[in-house]
Amino acid sequence: MSIAGTIDAPLDLFGGLVNDMPASDLPQGVSPDCQDVAFLQGAVKTRPGLLSVYTPIAGNPTVNYLKTYTQPDLVNTLLAIDSAGTLWGENSPGVLTQIAAGLTPKAAASSTSLFSREYIAQHDGNFGLDIPRQYDGTYLDRVSQIGPGAGPAAVGDVIANISAISRTSNVVTVTTAAPTGMLPTDQVIIAGVTDTSYNGTFPIASIIDSLHFTYAQTNSNSSSGGGTAAPVGSISAGVHQCAVIFVTRQGYLTRPSPPISWTAGGGMRANVTGIPSVATLPNVVARILAFTGAGGDLFYYTTGMDGAPQMQIFDNTASSFVVDFSDTALLAGIEADSLFQLVELGECAGVIGYSDRLFWWGERNKQNNWDNLTFDGGFGGSGNNVPLGWTPDATFFAGGSFDATGEAVWGGDYAILGDGVIATRGLMTQTALADYNGATRMQANTGYSARVRVRMTGALTQGTLHVHIYSSSLGISTTGVTVTPSQISAAWTEFIAPITPALGFLALPSDLLLRVYADGTPTAGAGFLVDNIEIFPTTQPYNTSLVRASFADDPESYDGVSGFMSVSENDGQTVRSAFLLRERLYFVKDRSLHVTEDDGVNEPASWTINQVSNAVGTPSVAGVDVGEDWAVIAGRAGMYLFDGGEPIKISQEIQPLWNTINWAAGQTLWVRVDTLNKRILCGVPTGTATSPNLILVLDYRSLSSSGEIESLGSILFSTLSGKLYAVGRSRKWCPWNITANSCTLAERSDGTAQIFLGNGPVGGAGNGKIYQLSDTQFSDDGAAINSYYTTYFFLSNDLEQTYQIRSHRKLFAYLTVYAEGAGNLNLSAFADNEAFPTALTTLPLSSPAPKDLELPINLLGERVAFQLGTNSPGAWFKLERFVPSLLPDPWAPVRGGN
């Protein structure tokens, strides 16, 4: 075929998608329609395919969280959480190993690395769903937890009655009725013996056993009885207080127990008995006894170092402990009073590390001054079956106990077992009015609700669990949370219900109680397991603008007074995400951006917070990511780039596509910056999808700075000519048809970082797979990649003038294509409008391409766009040059009518 008389109109600039203006008006070098392609310098190609990295997870769950965690030994471990609530880790390359099961199912997650641990927040996209957790490569523990639900049973001077006392050869042997805990280096006070010659203060000569000791005294041989023996001590006379603190294996000191007091006689030691047990708390490695000086109200403890008294108990089985201290030694110890202000961190949506602190947001609101609602504060009473801080009912507590199955959400949980005979089981209460300090729990005219996690144990078929408010004097017995066996299973389920009338009670009786019990004669040998009770004002279920901040270098301690920040409170928005940029901490709300920084003096509650933007925000925890000293924010109006100044929109060219995002599910979108390949990936739910079913990809490969990304859009405007034009160095957008619930840059054993994607639901179901984007994979796990690129409509007005062709019908006679790949290159032409495609002959691809591909087409049209692509498993293309040969229609350049 001859192409004599035709004009070549080469296209070697392949820009990104632009659909915010009519396709017929686009300048040369951009695309009105493309998908599943990636951009190279001077070329466009099929995007990387999906390579399944691991054996699919059983049950085909979706994978809702991915993150690389660097362990203390510097080994990189990919962490993954699936929709079944299982945490996985890649401990050996290519193999996932289960770390923990039983996390909240169907939850997403975010995390941050700090202090060689990974801190994880599980959420529903809006607020927290599960307790905050930390993973150190060995243990998956809760972040912060309550302290003991009650203090020790008693504290008293160490003094024992003497059962027998005798003197032989100037050595006195003493038998006591109870242990005194004395050491061979101690002195003992003997008083009240019938034979007064024995009385006095003497150095111990030897300890025979816990009930027998000797001391030297020159006198005649004799024996006697009565009296007391007390080791000489240093405790000052007067009223002292004692509280108990749990110490975890992560080094966290909990909030102290409610304190108890005793009056010391002076000059003796003290025996602390009934110390809260930690048998149900696997992460507690020690207990600390904190004391006040005589008549004081500030608590201190000492650690036994440098000759100081020992107040740490490392034997977790011990229920009693003898202490000896002077007020001088005590007050020179470690101050513990501030620990009473600690609050247990609630379920949060996100977490970030900054200035050696952790910051958490999206917390579910709860009251923090009830006793042992999570049952992590220990058990006591008969058989250690009563949760500390609760009062067992004298008649109906039978059947209540700690759960011995080890199935707690975390730490301990409360079990109510039936016997098939007695109707009411496991009844226990605590006051609903105020805590031991007098701080209010419930207020009049305020409605309250409760969250409770429940599961069954055994073959439970009858009975009803109740968590409600009760008063005998006023006849109050609210419905509260009620759970029947048909509502639960062997997995934890959370129930939320009001426990008071909507407007609360007009007056609060003195006997107002929170009650937990089961009635309806629960099945013998089966019952209810109860955990994580949370009480909150019904109208304030979430802390929308509050950010919890830990102490510096103390990531589990959250002060209820100074350890939080209020970010533009009461503005109708919620803190959704956070990021770091140039030593500053930014908080992103739904439609605003705020910044703070460590002032080096105060706790976070006193830091200054400034608003950066009152328009740019994100609906998603994962809606922000950081690139090379800049951040990107995905919001309802578009994608914005922020480099410390004013956020600049960088997605205007695809606004119609952005508008297809289902913002009712906007909390599920995610953003990830691939700094190696210079791409920004944004997974979004479009149409009616409720999770990300499309990835919007911005290629900035040819751009070297944030300023260029902001300013060099797909189409530029010439102030000289007043016309639009495209350039090679520009933003290039393209949608990728990939369904993925999560994305991360995974650190690999070869030293590279690769984009990993957690599968999302396709057809309503997941497949249990984690994918890697791979340039050597030419299918999506065996499925064809339908990749194509559509050119602009040839010719632009400028080129018509340049080639002197005029703006009438043209004959497109021939195509020359420089492309390589595999499979067949599919070609279509759109004459005058995208709505009217014409299929062209396919062309075989090879790599490398030995020559240009040529095709006669003889196509008429005022303007024509061409689409090239592949759509078979293993097929791919790379297009570097596209040349149509054309001339004015030699027969009828105009129709002469319509």
Describe the residue ranges of each PLM region:
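Beta-sheet repeat architectures centered on beta-propellers
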Residues: M1-T97, L103-R117, V239, R249, ...
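Extracellular carbohydrate recognition and processing domains
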Residues: L474-L508, L840-N858
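Extracellular beta-strand ligand-recognition surfaces/modules
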Residues: I496-I533, L860-P873
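Disordered, low-complexity "stalk" and linker segments at domain junctions of extracellular
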Residues: S2-I7, F14, I57-N60, G89, ...
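Ser/Thr/Gly-rich low-complexity blocks that favor extended beta-strand/coil architectures
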Residues: T180-I208, R249-P256, A290-T303, S472-G475
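Extracellular glycan-recognition surfaces and repeat-rich motifs
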Residues: G381-L417
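Beta-propeller and closely related beta-pinwheel folds
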Residues: L50-T62, A101-P105, R142-V155, I235-A237, ...
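Extra-cytoplasmic beta-strand recognition segments
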Residues: F375, F379, R425-T464, F495-L503, ...
